[in-house]
């Protein structure tokens, strides 16, 4: 229901949603007018028939919340639907590798980009997502490999599939990451030719406006959209303290599969607590409010084209 809601919300406001880890749901595809298909190092859920239905492809090299490492999905969350999507056994912890198994360097990345272009008949852009670490070098390598766009994901990003020490202490923050990525593209003569998408810690229209002012062409939100869905919020159906031993607002139980509001779970009883239509409206309202904040800031700077 969460992925359906995000797809519907993106369609309502005219932007794109992303499949994220583990493949595409047909219901998600039907809800999303514009869908970005992620290609992960693990290849979990990868399906060429789904790939060709996307409006863009995103090769994930790293994530800002856990750069240089893979991920771990606890077995309690690997129920039938997830296991089917990922073609793996139910109830078993699923570990994602830190790198793509079929390429070792930038030359192989260029080959992979070419393969994805051929698979999609050259119809859609191919983006590369980088965790913000060696930003200058990594952005240059991705741009030279032929990426149409580069997603620079900062350390302020979130994840439910990594150690707390990595989430809190590894990577580079959003502002310096954008500046370094912009200058890397400028040195190659590719600034404004290769799209720069900022993600990680974008929580408001002000954050988005700052990112664009620093040189990003677009922004992506993750945690903010989950909060708009109702993440960490007490609802009539939920009882945080009784169900997970934590109070609303301090949940941090995404990895358990017991999300009281029905977002980070596959339990049918919990999933039913999230109405996809109502949730989509909340997310759409949030994105519209971000847009209005950006417009206000832009107008205050004397710019007439918002």
Walk through the language-model features, giving the residues of each.
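N-terminal capping/small domains of soluble enzymes
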Residues: 1-82, 86-97, 108, 277, ...
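Glycine-rich phosphate/ribose-binding loops and adjacent secondary-structure elements
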Residues: 100-271
């Amino acid at each position: 229901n969460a992925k359906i809601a995000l797809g519907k919300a993106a369609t309502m406001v005219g932007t794109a949603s992303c499949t994220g880890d583990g493949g595409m749901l047909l219901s998600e595809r039907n809800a999303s007018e514009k869908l970005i298909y992620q290609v992960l190092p693990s290849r979990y859920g990868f399906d060429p028939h789904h790939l060709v239905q996307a409006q863009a492809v995103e090769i994930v090299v790293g994530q800002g919340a856990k750069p240089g490492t893979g991920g771990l999905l606890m077995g309690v969350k690997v129920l039938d639907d997830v296991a089917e999507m990922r073609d793996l056994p139910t109830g078993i912890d699923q570990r994602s590798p830190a790198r793509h198994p079929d390429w070792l360097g930038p030359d192989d990345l260029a080959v992979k980009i070419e393969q994805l272009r051929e698979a999609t008949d050259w119809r859609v852009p191919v983006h590369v997502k980088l965790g913000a670490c060696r930003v200058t070098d990594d952005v240059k390598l991705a741009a030279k490999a032929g990426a149409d766009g580069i997603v620079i994901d900062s350390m302020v990003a979130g994840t439910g599939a990594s150690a707390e020490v990595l989430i809190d202490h590894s990577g580079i923050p959003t502002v310096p990451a954008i500046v370094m990525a912009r200058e890397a593209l400028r040195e190659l003569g590719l600034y404004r030719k290769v799209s720069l998408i900022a993600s990680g810690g974008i929580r408001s229209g002000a954050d988005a406006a700052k990112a664009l002012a620093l040189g990003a062409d677009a922004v992506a939100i993750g945690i903010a959209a989950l909060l708009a869905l109702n993440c960490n919020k007490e609802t009539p159906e939920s009882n945080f303290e009784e169900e997970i031993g934590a109070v609303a607002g301090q949940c941090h139980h995404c990895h358990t599969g017991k999300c009281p509001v029905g977002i980070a779970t596959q339990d049918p009883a919990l999933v039913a607590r999230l109405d996809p239509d109502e949730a989509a409206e909340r997310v759409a309202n949030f994105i519209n409010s971000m847009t209005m904040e950006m417009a206000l800031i832009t107008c205050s700077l004397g710019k007439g084209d918002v």
